[in-house]
Amino acid sequence: MRKTVVAFAAAIAACSAVLSSTTTSAAPPATPITTLQADGTHLVDGYGRTVLLHGVNNVDKDAPYLPAGETLTPQDIDILVRHGFNTVRLGTSFDALMPQRGQIDEAYLDRLTGVVDALTARGMHVLLDNHQDGLSKAWGGNGFPEWAIESRPREWEPNPGFPLYYLMPSLNAGWDEVWGNTHGALDHLGTALGALAERVEGKPGVMGIELLNEPWPGSRFLSCFPNGCPDFDRTYQAAMQKLTDAVRAQNPTIPVYWEPNVTWNQMMPSNLFAPPVTPALTTADVVFAPHDYCIPSQLAIYLGLPQALRGLCVPQQDLTWSNIDAITERANVPTVITEFGDGDPTVLKNTLARADERFIGWQYWHFGAGNATDPFLGEVGRQLVRTYPQATAGEPGRMIFDADNGDFAYRFTPRAATRPTEIFVSDLHYPDGYAVQVDGGQVTSAPGARIVTVVADGSGPVTVKINRPGSAGAEVPDGPIETSSSGSSGSS
């Protein structure tokens, strides 16, 4: 059955703008938020729907952590909700959780859960990111409390700052302490993350805990080049399992997010979950959480190298995504890209197209607190703010979105769910409204709604197309969801 709805948006968009600026921040989401659990390579909500996450990072790296007046404001959250973002990767850290050996900072947990509650009240799924860069303040970094690491910079060592401080012998010695648990750093970190997990138990909007941001291999880093480091990854996987066990001892059902070691960002493959090199994954609700950065872009941003090198980003990111595909295939786990972009709009398409092809969610780096103006009104926002299925009452198929004109097409196969499919319609791409066409189902939302709801007519495939009035629209790509980078030019 074909249903067509045309939204006459001149009036509707104006009304929406007024409503978005006057509605109180306490307004609840239309569909109450539920926990997310892993189901094969997808995340599924409490209504039985497959969830796709589009969101941002918000990470406070420096003490005092999350002080009053410096957290996400109601206006910040309004911006995120208005643009259809449904997740925030919210930074926490070992140093914030346990500033003194063995002592959890309960006041900090109060502040952190206050931010969590403000986000989840608006329908945002929150990933708690145990963040670090450069290990500890001793090296000008952040993350681990200074009491947890005995190594210190030596007088003769120059400190080149991020990211080159990872080459400092003393910093590598500090990481060796972590992986060897020489002075109990992993034990104490497990206690801290366990306290965090216990505090957020029963909060359905918490989608999980990311155990450690961008873990560095320490003095074994050279062994990771040029083809990955199975010996270190064996040590690393054991450490992640240790932290997972500590978290699950306090909150048995909370999902945990594992990153690969950070040489992944330098194109090295991960050996996680790769028998016989490393153990097969047997723990439930583990989500793979890689980052997708373009090295030339990062070198231009942080070291001032020529921006023309960004032309190398496409083949580099193809390799990164082939490494993601390898993990997905062997471990059968969901993937969420928990960092990418770093303010560089020239590389956003590379990540977003590949994520769309694979029905993989993402969290953009970075969205700060206290925004006086909307940061998504430029080219970065035009890529990130997308029409997409936030929740699918069925098995997702192929999807495509054209960021230039807003043409969107999506196909899914229905299955039992207690709520309908929900598709967010970008508020940036349809200045004169949008048209919806559905084959195999029907629209149940009001004309011009920001969330289009769709129910299937039967058990056959459902195809949804959304575009500007008069546009020829997009066609759903043939075949199943991509599992390789061979078709990575589809969406933009």
From Swiss-Prot:
**Official protein name in the record:** Endoglycoceramidase I
Instruction: Sum up the protein's function in the record's words.
Output: Hydrolyzes glycosphingolipids; exhibits broad substrate specificity including monosialodihexosylganglioside (GM3), monosialotetrahexosylganglioside (GM1), fucosyl-GM1, lactosylceramide, globotriosylceramide, globotetraosylceramide, ganglioside GD1a, and ganglioside GD1b. No activity towards glucosylceramide and galactosylceramide.
| Membrane topology classification | Lipid-anchor
Give me the residues lipidated as N-palmitoyl cysteine: 15
Family, according to the entry, reads as follows: Belongs to the glycosyl hydrolase 5 (cellulase A) family.
This protein's species is Rhodococcus hoagii (strain 103S)
Residues of the active site are 214 (proton donor), 339 (nucleophile)
The residues forming the signal peptide are 1-14
Q: Which effect does the record note for changing residue 342 to N/Q?
A: Severely decreases enzyme activity
Q: Where in the cell is it found?
A: Secreted; Membrane
BP GO terms, sorted: galactosylceramide catabolic process; polysaccharide catabolic process
Question: So what does mutating residue 298 to A actually do?
Answer: Abolishes enzyme activity
